[in-house]
């Protein structure tokens, strides 16, 4: 009885690398579409805070979901605030108010001070 033909090992589930497929008729290779994530930014911040610490891909996925969730909440709240005040533009003021409304106590204070610092750094660099 003939043995079944062994195929190449399948790439890991959730792998972020671009996988090249078989060439098409015009000779170009197809690539897997890129997934946008906050992984590199989470990693950079983690290394600033804890240089000797690593992070698993599962934990990175959780952190990515967390950042996306917080982003959507802040953007949604800022959008509502702009709408209530009959404004068509979300400014840093709406973002700051949204952060104050969404985050509890001391966390909101730290977030606002870090945000203000980032905006100041950005405007002075221009």
Curated annotation (Swiss-Prot):
Q: Which InterPro entries match?
A: Histone-fold (IPR009072), Histone_H2A/H2B/H3 (IPR007125), Histone_H2B (IPR000558), HISTONE_H2B_site (IPR055333)
GO CC, sorted alphabetically, is: nucleosome; nucleus
CDD domains recorded: HFD_H2B
Chain intervals with Low complexity compositional bias: 1-12
Gene Ontology MF terms in the entry: DNA binding; protein heterodimerization activity; structural constituent of chromatin
Q: Which domain of life is it from?
A: Eukaryota
Record has Nucleotide-binding as a keyword = no
Which keywords are on file for this protein?
A: Acetylation, Chromosome, DNA-binding, Glycoprotein, Isopeptide bond, Nucleosome core, Nucleus, Phosphoprotein, Ubl conjugation
Residues recorded with modification Phosphoserine: 15
Note down the stretches annotated as region Disordered: 1-35
Entry-listed glycosylation sites: 113
What does the UniProt entry say about where the protein is found? Answer: Nucleus; Chromosome
Modified residue annotations for N6-acetyllysine: 6, 13, 16, 21
Glycyl lysine isopeptide (Lys-Gly) (interchain with G-Cter in ubiquitin) crosslink location in chain = 121
Membrane-crossing residues? none
Family matches, as Gene3D superfamilies: Histone, subunit A
UniProt keyword Phosphoprotein present: yes
Cited SMART domains: H2B
- PTM remark: Monoubiquitination of Lys-121 by BRE1 gives a specific tag for epigenetic transcriptional activation and is also prerequisite for histone H3 'Lys-4' and 'Lys-79' methylation. Phosphorylated on Ser-15 during developmentally programmed apoptosis; which may facilitate apoptotic chromatin condensation.
Assembly: The nucleosome is a histone octamer containing two molecules each of H2A, H2B, H3 and H4 assembled in one H3-H4 heterotetramer and two H2A-H2B heterodimers. The octamer wraps approximately 147 bp of DNA.
- Protein family (similarity comment): Belongs to the histone H2B family.
User: What does the UniProt record say this protein does?
Assistant: Core component of nucleosome. Nucleosomes wrap and compact DNA into chromatin, limiting DNA accessibility to the cellular machineries which require DNA as a template. Histones thereby play a central role in transcription regulation, DNA repair, DNA replication and chromosomal stability. DNA accessibility is regulated via a complex set of post-translational modifications of histones, also called histone code, and nucleosome remodeling.
- Please state what the protein is called: Histone H2B 1.2
Organism of provenance: Xenopus laevis
């Amino acid at each position: 009885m003939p043995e079944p033909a062994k195929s190449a090992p399948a790439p890991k589930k959730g792998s972020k690398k671009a996988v090249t497929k078989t060439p098409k008729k015009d000779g170009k290779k197809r690539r897997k579409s890129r997934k946008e994530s906050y992984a590199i930014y989470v990693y950079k911040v983690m290394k600033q805070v804890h240089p000797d610490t690593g992070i698993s891909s599962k934990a990175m996925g959780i952190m990515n979901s967390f950042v996306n969730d917080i982003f959507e909440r802040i953007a949604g709240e800022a959008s509502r605030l702009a709408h209530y005040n009959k404004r068509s533009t979300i400014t840093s003021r709406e973002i700051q108010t949204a952060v104050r409304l969404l985050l509890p106590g001391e966390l909101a204070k730290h977030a606002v001070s870090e945000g203000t610092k980032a905006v100041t750094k950005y405007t002075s660099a221009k």
